UniProtKB/Swiss-Prot annotation:
Keywords: ATP-binding, Helicase, Hydrolase, Mitochondrion, Nucleotide-binding, RNA-binding, Transit peptide. Residues 19-119 are annotated as: Disordered. A motif (DEAD box) lies at residues 353-356. Residues 195-406 form the Helicase ATP-binding domain. Residues 453-625 form the Helicase C-terminal domain. The gene is drh-15. This is ATP-dependent RNA helicase mrh4, mitochondrial. It comes from Neurospora crassa (strain ATCC 24698 / 74-OR23-1A / CBS 708.71 / DSM 1257 / FGSC 987). CDD domains: DEADc_MRH4 (cd17965), SF2_C_DEAD (cd18787). It holds the Pfam family DEAD. It catalyses: ATP + H2O = ADP + phosphate + H(+). Residues 19-28 have a biased composition (Low complexity). It is found in: Mitochondrion. The keyword Transit peptide applies. The lineage of its organism: Eukaryota, Fungi, Dikarya, Ascomycota, Pezizomycotina.
Length: 625
């Protein structure tokens, strides 16, 4: 009878019952398996803290009738597999075909090697493939000079005479070779351009490493568009005729005396180019670069930021002589646009610099409101950043499906010309005293600078940046360094404006800084004494003064966008939380093909494996993930 009941059960049910029994038995024999798996589970990082692995890969081109909406994922029903002739497989997720033959043993070794394990455990992703990097390098070779761009002659002269004045060799950087012709609509290479959006607007992403010249890459096409627009604008042409007639009628009187009584310019409070940046320091920096071009090409650029008085901000925007370009922070411009919506009615070019920061939580509301108000008249939308997190990549795919992605070969990579050193603070002589280790590292740099082979009457002044993770730590570290005879200042949002601008001016200047050597050579003597005790023991503070160094202790406020050409040394007091912070902080050194050095202070609670893999990736020239 049991045999008859057993034969009445089909083979599939019998197999399922056997599998269930074996699984439950295995679970009872190995009760640790579930606990072990759960313990190794890690909390996922937010997408805004994770680098994107498909920066250079645009979304698939949709048909003419599909519009800009993202296709909705429909769940498969019970009969979804019936009457199909084509497999429902996403070609982007399809596995890549394996190579037929391995070229060498090195390929096999690289294939089996699991690199950057600690970085990948932090949910960071790989960058663009090396095949795409090679193709980008080939396209870059077609441009060797600014004369090859379709720019107006006056703009070309402004680049050579003002923007790059003093440089012995004037050549475009990699991002400028790729971005300027794309923004001008100049066909370069074999890569087809993405189609325009439904209203004829063009969207671009400029993703390039820190210190690569992105500011000039988006300013030059914008200035070229301003000058072309002046020639074609009938309102501006008629205003200039009336202004010339008024000058002749007044008989050579200064324009500044009567211009406010004359009719306002058509561009008064109606800029055609808007550049958004996250901080007031970046407003000043971008404005200074734009004014160099404006001095030669004759257009009007004005800054708007919280560091400027409200009365001056009002004059900059509502000046009777008009304004062509505005450089502002998002919150201030969004507030002005809310009270005066017509401010953004004539904007044709909108640039969002440091897009990964401006489209993050703190700035996204103001930034998106500005973009929405400028959309009706917008011709070009340009996003710029040195790091593209996954959150920003998803945002661009949903909001701007036709965006043209312009990436450089070294995206998400720290240049090899920047060397990284690691100091283990947990060992002797520091014994977990990071402040002591930081002061000792700065004294060592000052001691090396005092031994240079230049004139004996002068010594070089080294400008050093120290980065911390917490704003409260900046003042503590700065006070400790000052007590050890080091000229240091804390840079954060509460720092006085005049002191902040004074220190930043010395760090962004391209000119070398030198001081006269003391007669008794007390710098070397003090450095030698400081080196004996790790720069910690001294009873006379005047004897241990280090005059040939200037130090800024800052948070990420100074790690984004500021063009610190004079900085050669960067000290990471705290280990950065993500590779994005590594890229921006170490990117303050080694800018514009200059050498630099980074020093990381690693304590007992820091991730040593992450620091080791970042150092190895920098040595190998690999992109961080």
């Amino acid at each position: 009878m049991w045999k008859t009941a057993r034969d009445s059960v089909c083979l599939i049910c019998r197999s399922a019952a056997t599998t269930t029994t074996s699984t439950s038995a295995r679970a009872s024999l190995e009760p640790w398996a579930g606990q072990r798996t759960f313990s190794t589970r890690r909390e996922q990082r937010p997408s805004r803290m994770v680098l994107s692995d498909r920066v250079a890969r645009p979304p698939p081109v949709r048909g003419p009738g599909e519009g800009n909406k993202k296709p909705r994922n429909k769940p498969d029903g019970p009969w979804a597999g019936m009457n199909r002739r084509v497999a429902n497989i996403d070609p982007r997720k399809a596995p890549k075909p394996k190579p037929v033959e391995e070229d060498s043993r090195r390929d096999k070794r690289d294939k089996n090697t699991k690199g950057q394990k600690a970085l990948k455990m932090q949910r960071a992703l790989a960058t663009i493939s090396y095949g795409q990097r090679t193709s980008i390098k080939e396209r870059m070779q077609e441009i060797q000079a600014f004369d090859q761009f379709d720019l107006l002659p006056v703009v070309k002269e402004a680049i050579a005479q003002e923007a790059l004045k003093g440089m012995t060799e004037i050549k475009p950087t990699p991002v400028q070779r790729l971005a300027i012709p794309a923004l001008l609509g100049q066909p370069m290479g074999r890569k087809p351009r993405r189609p325009k959006s439904d209203n004829g607007r063009e969207e671009f992403l400029l993703a390039a490493e820190t210190g690569s010249g992105k500011t000039l890459a988006y300013l030059v096409p914008a200035v070229n568009a301003i000058k072309k627009g002046d020639a074609d604008d009938e309102l501006v042409a008629s205003y200039n005729e009336r202004l010339a007639a008024e000058k002749e009628r007044r008989g050579g009187a200064p324009v500044s005396e009567w211009i406010e009584k004359f009719e306002p310019h058509p561009n008064t409070a109606r800029p055609r180019v808007v550049v958004l940046v996250p901080t007031a320091e970046l407003v000043d920096q971008v404005t200074s670069v734009a004014k160099k071009l404006a001095h030669y090409t004759k257009f009007k650029v004005r800054p708007l930021s919280a560091s400027i008085s409200p009365l001056r901000n009002q004059r900059n925007l509502y000046s009777p002589i008009g304004v062509d370009m505005i450089v502002s922070t998002p919150h201030l411009l969004a507030t002005i646009a809310k009270s005066d919506p017509n401010v953004l009615s004539r904007v044709s070019h909108l640039v969002i610099d440091e897009a990964d920061s401006l489209l993050d939580r703190s700035f996204s509301g103001d930034t998106t409101s500005i973009v929405d108000r400028a959309m009706p008249s917008l011709k070009q939308l340009i996003l710029c950043s040195a790091t593209i997190p996954r959150r920003l990549d998803t945002y661009m795919e949903e909001q701007f499906p036709y965006i043209n992605r312009i990436t450089t070969p070294n995206l998400h990579a720290i240049p090899r010309r920047v060397q990284l050193g690691v100091i283990d603070v947990s060992k002797d002589p520091y014994r977990n005293n990071k402040m002591l280790a930081c002061a000792d590292a700065i004294w060592s740099i000052g001691k090396e600078a005092a031994k240079h082979e230049g004139p004996k009457s002068e010594i070089d002044v080294k400008r050093i940046m120290v980065f911390v993770n917490e704003r409260e730590t900046t003042q503590q570290v700065a006070d400790y360094l000052v007590s050890k005879g080091i000229d240091a200042i804390a840079l954060h949002r509460d720092t006085e404006e005049h002191r902040k601008s004074e220190m930043l001016a010395s760090f962004t200047s391209n000119e070398p800084m030198k001081i006269s050597r003391p007669a008794d050579d007390d710098v070397a003597a003090a450095a030698a004494e400081g080196g004996k005790a790790g720069g910690a023991v001294s009873s006379s503070p005047t004897r241990r003064h280090l005059p040939n160094t200037k130090v800024i202790v800052a948070t990420d406020l100074a790690s984004r966008g500021i063009d610190t050409l004079a900085v050669r040394y960067v000290v990471l007091y705290d280990v950065p939380h993500t590779t994005i912070d590594f890229i921006h902080r170490l990117g303050r050194a080694g800018r514009m093909n200059r050498r630099g050095r980074g020093i990381v202070l690693v304590g007992k609670d820091d991730r040593r494996d992450v620091v080791a893999e970042v150092k190895e990736s920098m040595f190998m020239g690999q992109a961080l993930v």
